[in-house]
Amino acid sequence: MAGPDDQHLSGMRVEYGSVEKDGSPDLDTDWLYDGWLTLFCKWIDDAERAGVAEPNAMVLATVANGRPVSRSVLCKGADEAGIIFFTNYDSDKGDDLAATPYASVTFPWYQLGRQVHIRGPVSTVDPQVSEDYWSKRPRGSQLGAWASHQSRPIASRTALLDQLLEVTVRFADSELIPLPPNWGGYLIVPEVVEFWQGRENRVHNRIRVTGGCIERLQP
């Protein structure tokens, strides 16, 4: 049965750019001959300069009991080895990755008509990497990580704030808050990286990098 907003939703449409329309160059395989990382970092920088909120936000998809689950997280590192993010290892995503250490992430920069999709095996990072990042987090974020038993049910927001107050008091005299034993980073090692650029008439540009192979894909 059609909902009251179906007609409105079906009519939503954004027209993408083109060389002729706005001078934006077409994504080309030549841009990727030195690997995926240079263009990826450039697109992150472009998104930041364009005022995109949280240009390092990515949609992380994991598998739970054979069923996909997705959520938004923040990328906190990118190099030739892969993409790094941090979380509670006892969270739902941590449980998923313990059972199936493979994931995909998508960086959607809607304002620019671009996205990058990356997928590959996942492993926990070296504990020192987690320590280094943890030491740079704001104190409030550190307290929040200690307070939250991530993904577990709780009776109310008041109860959650009570937990935050408890850890705030516990660490009140501590200049440095220690890294929780169940908190740290994951590394996604790129097996496949796909760059997508929206183009006029939905004839989009898609280029996939798999190892040393660079392929243009039909939209």
From Swiss-Prot:
Pfam family of the protein (one): PNPOx_N
GO terms (BP aspect): pyridoxine biosynthetic process
Obligatory cofactor(s): FMN
Chain segments annotated as transmembrane: none
Reactions catalysed, as given in the entry: pyridoxamine 5'-phosphate + O2 + H2O = pyridoxal 5'-phosphate + H2O2 + NH4(+); pyridoxine 5'-phosphate + O2 = pyridoxal 5'-phosphate + H2O2
Subunit structure: Homodimer.
NCBIfam families: pdxH, PRK05679.1
Family in the record: Belongs to the pyridoxamine 5'-phosphate oxidase family.
Function: Catalyzes the oxidation of either pyridoxine 5'-phosphate (PNP) or pyridoxamine 5'-phosphate (PMP) into pyridoxal 5'-phosphate (PLP).
Protein name: Pyridoxine/pyridoxamine 5'-phosphate oxidase
Top-level taxonomy: Bacteria, Bacillati, Actinomycetota, Actinomycetes, Mycobacteriales
Gene: pdxH
